[in-house]
Amino acid sequence: MTFVETVAVPDNEERPSAGHNRPVADSTKCPNAREMKVQNRVAQRTHHRRLKTKLEVLRERLKEPEKQVGEPARVQTSTSTLVSDAATSLADSMCLVPAVQNDQAMAFDFLMTPSPSVGNDCPSNDLETMRQAASVHSNTLGGAFPLNRSPCTENMTPESQVSLSTAPLCFTSVVPAELDMDAFCTLDSSDWSRPNEESLLRLANYSTSVSPTNVQWGVDENAPLQDRVRYMRDQAVAMGFGSLDDVVEAHYTQKLECTSPSFQEQRLSRNRRLSRLLSTLHNAAKDWSEWERRGLQEQVTQGAEDILVSELNSYITQRSMNSTDDKIITGGLLDEQSRLRQDVEERRRLQDSLPNLGALLTTLLSRSNAPNQDARRDTVLAMIKTMCFDQDENMSIS
């Protein structure tokens, strides 16, 4: 503000000293100078009073937060009820809806999708990660929102009100309701950034022993194999499967929709990966105990029997419909050259119609020190003819 300064000059109008260079206002030449001076002083005093009033108001406003900071934080006896809603919603998001449990294709797609992350600052099995998550102090939130309280706490009783700015955001958002958080709660808000080692171990033990329907923290790809297998087993159970074996069984046997992403994956697995899987199981079973591999060997043997019997029955049915085969079986009147030609055709037909049975008999003869390759082929042909002879006799009698 600019102030107009006037200097009263005596009646004799003495000249100012030579060293005084400031101009002097003459009241005779400026008749309103005194009035302007009075008005300026009044305006200045009014402005000072307004500033003083504003300062007093600001001081009163600052006194109330200072009192709240000085008072100890009142914490509820157990904070599990405050975090139950958030934990339940997150746990529900990990569980399957009935539609997914009843739909194998949808369950496969959901199982192969990475589980939703709850944030890098949330507690995990690593104690160091939990320490970093727990180090979120109230000052971090207080800088932007000083001493703000949630509107939902206005109607709560004083015993159940908890200052949201003094609690770590991670613990109040995703901690399961079943986990007792009393060990993390202290009367001093500064202790939030330094939870004791026992509390961290309790949280770590809970996260490793949690049931599949509860919160899943996820497993890193560099984790030990047993941890990754256990995580996939828990995910399979959460998808509605009984075990990982049920997942593999459904993957190879269930009829999936053509539009499902798992459909092409299933076809590729049946054609290429299944044979490699069976070979790996067969080789690995050699190191298992007799009790462990008994079931696998029985199923493999039974499956081989079904395949060989089915091939033989199909071949017999095909032979019975071909009249020329009767001459080969009964040794009809054919010259030596015609008989040799018939034998070659018969071997070729055997290779096409009985690939597995022929391979099995050839392998057995090769390990029994048979004389030569031609003799093994003749022996295989004779064995197959013998197996078909009784069937042909029964058909001719009937």
Curated annotation (Swiss-Prot):
Residues 34-50 are annotated as: Basic motif. Disruption phenotype: Decreases the expression of the entire KK-1 biosynthesis cluster genes and almost eliminates KK-1 production. Residues 31-62 form the bZIP domain. Belongs to the bZIP family. Residues 51-58 are annotated as: Leucine-zipper. Keywords: DNA-binding, Nucleus, Transcription, Transcription regulation. It comes from Curvularia clavata. This is Transcription factor kk1f. GO terms for molecular function: DNA binding. Pathway: Secondary metabolite biosynthesis. Signal peptide: none annotated. Residues 1-28 are annotated as: Disordered. Transcription factor; part of the gene cluster that mediates the biosynthesis of KK-1, a novel cyclic depsipeptide with 10 residues which is a promising active compound with high activity against many plant pathogens, especially Botrytis cinerea. Positively regulates the expression of all the genes from the KK-1 biosynthesis gene cluster. GO terms for cellular component: nucleus. It is found in: Nucleus.
